[in-house]
Amino acid sequence: LSRKKNIDIIYKANHKGKILADSQAFERIMNNLIDNAIKYSENDSKIIIATSNEVDEYIKVIVEDNGSGISPEDKDHIFSRFFRTASARATDNQGSGLGLAIVKHLVNSLNGEVGVQNSESKGSIFWFTVPLA
């Protein structure tokens, strides 16, 4: 889908250490966040995936898009099961509203945290932390 929409995916690794996480859970988290970023980004845009060490024992991963953003009302519910934003319901984007709930569950099971920062109409930055080995 990223090729069809001509979206560049840019990876910026800036962390030290190995991630202490179940590889399948980590892969599922990344797939869900990247799939959403692609789905809600405009054609001919970019998605940034970056890693950093904000706290010595954790790695922080961000997935940043330049899609429609998330309204303040929707932000409080974005990780709830079956929740879809108003903008998602108004488009042809398919989804069950489970992807971000799964992300939250998996990140919590890995002893990490997850959140979102955004500016409506300027995209979203989803982030999560997981422990380092």
Role assignments for model-derived ranges:
Residues 65:
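Acidic ATP/Mg2+-coordinating residue in the GHKL
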Residues 3, 8-17, 54:
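Conserved catalytic submotifs in the C-terminal HATPase_c
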Residues 26-30:
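A residue-level detector for a conserved hydrophobic packing site
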Residues 44-57:
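Short beta-strand/loop element within the Bergerat-fold HATPase_c
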Residues 69-80:
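Short helix N-cap motif at coil->helix boundaries in the Bergerat
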